[in-house]
Amino acid sequence: MATLLLEDGTIESNLDEIVRELAPLGIYLKHYDPGTSILFPHLLTQDALTDKEKCHIVDLHNSVFEFIQQENGYLWCDLLNVHPGSPNLQTLIATYAQYHTHTAPEALYVLAGEMIFGFVKPDGSQVQLLVQSQDYLHIPSGVEHWCSLTASLNFKAVRYFTAADGWVPNYTGTRLNDSLNK
């Protein structure tokens, strides 16, 4: 389940409260239990996956969660699989660890692992959201955010796209608030 860290150090783990905190940004967060991870647990524990295994995971996931694509107008999806041996891991981390926006929404369903997303709220305050297995996150276009892997460096998620070119980051130059940089 997701948790939210506020600037004052408060940690919120109640999903309804997290959703309320993120509502001014238009962010949608939902936890689906059980998730599709029960359909392919052996593949979720592997670091490296073949293209065939990735397609198998996405196909099984879509057989259960096809409504996510239909309800939100997503055109396509893929599997993001990051692990300590991923090629260009440090480049990937550096690319998304800076505050940025996208012209298209960013949406994903977490299959395994965890990731941290930082957001700038309308009042300028910042929050950090930890998403975990079975969490679905939709970030509207234009929302200022960053994301980072946790120390495990393991993360698998189905990513959803509304544009052919995916999520192209537009960097904003906003700095991470020191109270959240722990």
Curated annotation (Swiss-Prot):
Enzyme Commission numbers on file: 1.13.11.54, 1.13.11.53
UniProt binding sites for Ni(2+): H100, H102, E106, H145
Membrane spanning residue stretches: none
Keywords recorded for this protein, A-Z: Amino-acid biosynthesis, Dioxygenase, Iron, Metal-binding, Methionine biosynthesis, Nickel, Oxidoreductase
Gene3D superfamilies linked: Jelly Rolls (2.60.120.10)
InterPro entries associated with the record: ARD, ARD_bac, RmlC-like_jellyroll, RmlC_Cupin_sf
Enzyme class: oxidoreductase
CDD domains assigned: cupin_ARD
Pathway the protein takes part in: Amino-acid biosynthesis; L-methionine biosynthesis via salvage pathway; L-methionine from S-methyl-5-thio-alpha-D-ribose 1-phosphate: step 5/6
Bound cofactor: record note: Binds 1 Fe(2+) cation per monomer. Binds 1 nickel ion per monomer.
GO molecular function per UniProt: acireductone dioxygenase (Ni2+-requiring) activity; acireductone dioxygenase [iron(II)-requiring] activity; iron ion binding; nickel cation binding
Cofactor: Fe(2+); Ni(2+)
Chain positions recorded as Fe(2+) binding sites: H100, H102, E106, H145
Superkingdom, natural source: Bacteria
A Pfam family: ARD
GO term, biological process aspect, one: L-methionine salvage from methylthioadenosine
Catalysed reaction equations from the record: 1,2-dihydroxy-5-(methylsulfanyl)pent-1-en-3-one + O2 = 3-(methylsulfanyl)propanoate + CO + formate + 2 H(+); 1,2-dihydroxy-5-(methylsulfanyl)pent-1-en-3-one + O2 = 4-methylsulfanyl-2-oxobutanoate + formate + 2 H(+)
Family according to the record: Belongs to the acireductone dioxygenase (ARD) family.
Oligomer and partners: Monomer.
Role description: Catalyzes 2 different reactions between oxygen and the acireductone 1,2-dihydroxy-3-keto-5-methylthiopentene (DHK-MTPene) depending upon the metal bound in the active site. Fe-containing acireductone dioxygenase (Fe-ARD) produces formate and 2-keto-4-methylthiobutyrate (KMTB), the alpha-ketoacid precursor of methionine in the methionine recycle pathway. Ni-containing acireductone dioxygenase (Ni-ARD) produces methylthiopropionate, carbon monoxide and formate, and does not lie on the methionine recycle pathway.
Name of the protein in its database record: Acireductone dioxygenase
UniProt organism field: Nostoc sp. (strain PCC 7120 / SAG 25.82 / UTEX 2576)
Gene for this chain: mtnD
